[in-house]
Amino acid sequence: MTAPGFVEFPDSPFHLYQPYPPAGDQPGAIDALTEGVSDGLMFQTLLGVTGSGKTYTMANMIARLGRPALVLAPNKTLAAQLYAEMREFFPRNAVEYFVSYYDYYQPEAYVPTRDLFIEKDSSINEHIEQMRLSATKSLLERRDTVIVGTVSCIYGIGNPGDYHAMVLILRTGDRISRREVLARLVAMQYTRNDADFTRGVFRVRGETIDIFPAESPELALRLTLFDDEIESLELFDPLTGRVRQKLPRFTVYPGSHYVTPRETVLRAIETIKEELRERLAQLIADGKLVEAQRLEQRTRFDLEMLQELGFCKGIENYSRHLSGAAPGEPPPTLIDYLPADALMFIDESHVTIGQLGGMYRGDRSRKETLVQYGFRLPSALDNRPLRLEEFEARMRQCVFVSATPAAYEQEHADNVVEQVVRPTGLVDPIVEVRPAHTQVDDLLGEIHKRAALQERVLVTTLTKRMAEDLTDFLSEHGVRVRYLHSDIDTVERVEIIRDLRLGVFDVLVGINLLREGLDIPEVSLVAILDADKEGFLRSERSLIQTIGRAARNLNGRAILYADRITDSMRRAIDETERRRAKQIQHNTDHGITARGVSKAVRELIDGVVAPAGHDALESAVPAEVLTDEKAMAREIRRLEKLMMDHARNLEFEQAAAARDALNALKSRLLLDGVG
C-alpha cells in the first residue's frame, strides 16, 4: 500500500491528502464522473453504498478537476461530518462551512384570528456567522475553495456585486485619511468599540486603527497611519497583542452579507417610497384603514433608519429594492457567488432535493398574511428561498450522491456510476426476517450477545410511544440504552452519537433519525421493528438506508421483524443481496480479506479528536515515556503548553483534563524519584 501523503494534479490548485490510494469501486467511479464533467454532462449520479467512501471520491474529483465546489447535505449534522472529512482531505486549501447561523429562529408572523403579531426573534451563532462570511470571502478570493453547506444556501444573502464593491483594500504606502477609513468601516457595518474588541469591531488610538475582520476566527489587523499615509499593516493576536505577521496589503471584507453602497441605498429609498404610495392607495380604496396606518408607520420608520444608518431591522424584506431586481425575481443567494465553472455535489440527494422543493411554499404562506394585514410591503414576498426550478436554472455541473436515488435523480442523470465495492472489502450486512409477534424478546437476546462483544445496536420503531416504551423495557432489563427523537437539538444529537461510538451506552432507539449518512462503524446490528407496515418509514428507500447503518462493521447484520414480506421489503432485500453478491465476488477475484473500519471519534465542527477524559490522557502517554526521565520531562512541557493553549481558547474542560494528566505525571516522577 502507498504511504499516506499529498497528491497534486496538473493545473489544479488543490493539494489532496490521500491517507490511502483509491480502492474498490473508487478508481472507476472517479474516472467515470471526472470524464462526464469534462464532457460537459450537467447531471450525474453516484450510486454509492454506505461505507464505500463517497466523500473520498468527491474529494478526488474536486482535486482532479481543479474547480471550486459546493457540497450540499440534508442537515447540519451531516454537513458537519462532511466538513470535518473534507478538511482532512484538503488541509492546505480553503474548506468552508455554510449553514444557517440561527441557534433559534422565530420568523415574523401574524395570526389574524387572535389579532396577534409575533415579532421576529432569533439567536445568531457567532461562530457560524464568521464561517459563512469566511465562505463568501474564499469564493471571491481563491479558486481552491470547497464549501460544505445545507439548504440554507438557497435563502437570500446580499448581492455579490454590492458585497464586492464594499471591500476596503489597504496597501502600505497608500494615501487615505483616518476619517475616510473610519467612515468606510462604519459603512461596512463594523462598529467602534474601544473597550470590547471582538469580531466585526474596530478601535482607534491616535494614528493606530485596530480592525477585527468579521470573517476572521482569531487574528485582527493593526493599521498604523503616518499623517494620511498607511505606514504599516500587521496581523496580531487580539488576546496577547503579539504581532504574528507584517503585510504589504490587506482586504477588509464587509461585516455582513447585507451591506449596500450608499448610492444603492438612496436609490432603494425612492423606490420603496413609490411602492408605499401605491400600496397605501390600494388599502385605503379597499377600506383597510388600520392596515394602511400600520404599514405607513412601520415603513416610514425603516426608511428613516436606512436614510441615517444605511441599514435597518428586517432589511432583508427590502432586498428586491436594494438589488434592483424586478417584481417576482428571487434574491441573490450563495449560488450567485459561485463561479460559472464550479462543481456541485448534492449528498443524500433523495432527501436534499425534496427539501429544496419544499422551502418556498411554507415561507410564501406566512409572508402573504403579513402583506395582507399591512405589516409588510408586497415586495417582501420576494425575500424568499429559491423555487426548485430557479435553483435548477442556477445549478452548475452537478453530481447527485445517494445509496438510494429517487425519481428526480433517475429522470435527470445523464450518467449513473455505481460505487458498490468498498475499499475495506466489507460486504453489505446479512438480512434476516424474523416473526414480529416475538420481536421484543428476540431483540433483547440479540442485544445481550452484541453487548458482550463490545458492539453497538441500532433499533428503529414506527412511533414515539413505541420507542419510549421499548427504551423503558430494555433499561429495566439492564441494557444501557438511549432514545434519539426529534425534540433533541443538533448539538445534543451529535453528542449522543459520539457517546454511542465511545461505548457510554450500547443501544440507540430511534424512529426516523437512524438513516442517511450516520457513520457509526461500531454498530454490528440494526433491528427494524414492524418492518411489514407499508408506508414512508418502511418504504424500499428507508429500509435500504436503515440496513446500510450496519454495513461499516465486519459482523454487520440486519434483522427485519415482520409477519409477512411486503413489496418494499422484497425489493430492499433483493437490492442488498445483489450488492452483497457483487462485493463478495470482487473480494474473491482480487483475494481481498474484509477488514473492519477503525475511525477516530472526533468533534465534527472543529474537526479535531474528541477531548480525552482525565484517565485517557494519562493512559495515552506512551509506556517508554514513563521509563525515560528526559522523555517524561518533555511530555510534562508538552502537557503544560497544551493546558495553557486550552485555557487561552477558553476550553476549560480540556484544560482541566490536561492539568490532571500533568499532575499525575508529576506525581509519578516524584514517586519514581523517591523509590
UniProtKB/Swiss-Prot annotation:
Helicase ATP-binding domain residues are: 35-422
Q: Where along the chain is ATP bound?
A: G48, V49, T50, G51, S52, G53, K54, T55
Query: Residue ranges of the Helicase C-terminal domain?
Result: 439-605
UniProt short sequence motif Beta-hairpin, positions renumbered to this chain: 101-124
Q: Where in the cell is it found?
A: Cytoplasm
Q: Name one GO cellular component term.
A: excinuclease repair complex
The UniProt entry, under Gene3D superfamilies, shows: 6.10.140.240, P-loop containing nucleotide triphosphate hydrolases, UVR domain
The record's comment about this protein's domains reads: The beta-hairpin motif is involved in DNA binding.
Family assignment from sequence similarity: Belongs to the UvrB family.
Protein name per UniProt: UvrABC system protein B
Q: Organism, per UniProt?
A: Bordetella bronchiseptica (strain ATCC BAA-588 / NCTC 13252 / RB50) (Alcaligenes bronchisepticus)
